[in-house]
C-alpha cells in the first residue's frame, strides 16, 4: 500500500489555485484547536479534582463520623477518617499534575504555531509573487495578441492599397506595417520574458509547496503523537488515582477486619457498668392495715419489727459510790 503523503496529494491544475495548501492549513488549524480543547479539558478536570479534594478534606476534618464509638470500631473509624483525608490529598495532587499536563500542551501548541508561522510567511510571499507574475504575464500576452492583430490589419491594408495611385498613402501604410511588425517583435519578446519569469516563479512555488507539505506533515505527525501520548498519560493518571484510592481504602478494610463485636461489648460493660443486683420488687401496702398497726409516737415503727421483752431493772448497789439510784436523780441543784 502506497503511503499517502501531503506533497503528492494537494495540487491543483489551476496555477492560481491554493486549494490544496488551504486544505492543509485548515486541517492544521483544526488540530491546533483540538489541542486547545483538550488543554481546556485538563484545566477544567483539574479544577474539579481540586474542588472535590478540598471538599472531601473539609468533610473528613470537620464533619463528625461516629465520634462516640469505642474500642476496636473507634480505631477503624480513625483509620477511615485518615484514609479519606489521604484520598482527598491525592485528588489535590492529581489536580496539580493535570495542570502541569495542560501547561505542556499549551507549550507544544505555541511551539508548533511558531514553526508554522515561518513556513506560512514563505508560502504567503510566494503565492503573492506567483499571482503578480501571472497577472503580468497575462497582460503581456494580451498586449502581444493585440500587436499581432494590429500587424495583420496593417498587412491587409497594404494589400488592399496595391492599386492606389497615391504613393504617399501607400508609404504611410508601409510605415504603419513596419511599425506594427516592430511592435509585434517587442511585445513577443516581452511576453516570452514574462513566461520565462513565471515559469521560474512556478518552479520556486512548487519547491516551496513541497517543502511546506513535508514540514506540515511532519508537524501533524508530531501533533498526533503528542496528543495521543497526552491522552494516554491522562487516563493513566486517572487509573493510578483509582489504584491509590483503593489501596488506601484497603487499609480501612483491614482495620475493619480487626473489629471485634464481643470486645467492644465487653469494653463498654467494663467502662460503664453500674451494678449486678437488680432492684427488689415493690410490695403492695394497704393503707388501712397500716393505720391499725400504728404505734404511739416515740416508739419505733416499721414493717415486721420483732417485739422486745421488758427492759431489765438494775439492782441497787448502795455500796457503789459511782452508782446512783433513780430516786436520787433531781433536776434541781442542791
From Swiss-Prot:
Phosphorylated on tyrosine. CDD domains: F-BAR_PSTPIP2. Its main location: cytoplasm. It is found in: Cytoplasm; Membrane. Residues 295-322 are annotated as: Disordered. Disulfide bonds: none annotated. One of its GO terms (cellular component) is cytoplasm. Binds to F-actin. May be involved in regulation of the actin cytoskeleton. This is Proline-serine-threonine phosphatase-interacting protein 2. It comes from Homo sapiens (Human).
Amino acid at each position: 500500500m502506497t503511503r499517502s503523503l501531503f506533497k503528492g496529494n494537494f495540487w491543483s491544475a489551476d496555477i492560481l489555485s491554493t486549494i490544496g495548501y488551504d486544505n492543509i492549513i485548515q486541517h492544521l488549524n483544526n488540530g491546533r484547536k483540538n489541542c486547545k480543547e483538550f488543554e481546556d479539558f485538563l484545566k477544567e478536570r483539574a479544577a474539579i479534582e481540586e474542588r472535590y479534594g478540598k471538599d472531601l478534606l473539609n468533610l473528613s476534618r470537620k464533619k463528625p463520623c461516629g465520634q462516640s464509638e469505642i474500642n476496636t470500631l473507634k480505631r477503624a473509624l480513625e483509620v477511615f477518617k485518615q484514609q479519606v483525608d489521604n484520598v482527598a490529598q491525592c485528588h489535590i495532587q492529581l489536580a496539580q499534575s493535570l495542570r502541569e499536563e495542560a501547561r505542556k500542551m499549551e507549550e507544544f501548541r505555541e511551539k508548533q504555531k511558531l514553526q508554522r508561522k515561518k513556513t506560512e510567511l514563505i508560502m504567503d510571499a510566494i503565492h503573492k509573487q506567483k499571482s503578480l507574475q501571472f497577472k503580468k504575464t497575462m497582460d503581456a500576452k494580451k498586449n502581444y495578441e493585440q500587436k499581432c492583430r494590429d500587424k495583420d490589419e496593417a498587412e491587409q491594408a497594404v494589400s488592399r492599397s496595391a492599386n492606389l495611385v497615391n504613393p504617399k498613402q501607400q508609404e504611410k501604410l508601409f510605415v504603419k506595417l513596419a511599425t506594427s511588425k516592430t511592435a509585434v517583435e517587442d511585445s513577443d519578446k516581452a511576453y516570452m520574458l514574462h513566461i520565462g519569469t513565471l515559469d521560474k516563479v512556478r518552479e520556486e512555488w512548487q519547491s516551496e509547496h513541497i517543502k511546506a507539505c513535508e514540514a506540515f506533515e511532519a508537524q501533524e505527525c508530531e501533533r498526533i503523537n503528542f496528543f495521543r501520548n497526552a491522552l494516554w498519560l491522562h487516563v493513566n493518571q486517572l487509573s493510578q488515582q483509582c489504584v491509590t484510592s483503593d489501596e488506601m481504602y484497603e487499609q480501612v478494610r483491614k482495620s475493619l477486619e480487626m473489629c471485634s463485636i464481643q470486645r467492644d461489648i465487653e469494653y463498654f460493660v467494663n467502662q460503664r457498668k453500674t451494678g449486678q443486683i437488680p432492684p427488689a420488687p415493690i410490695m403492695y401496702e394497704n393503707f388501712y392495715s397500716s393505720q391499725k398497726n400504728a404505734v404511739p409516737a416515740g416508739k419505733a415503727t416499721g414493717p415486721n419489727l420483732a417485739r422486745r421483752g421488758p427492759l431489765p431493772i438494775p439492782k441497787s448497789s448502795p455500796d457503789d459510790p459511782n452508782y446512783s439510784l433513780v430516786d436520787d436523780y433531781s433536776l434541781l441543784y442542791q
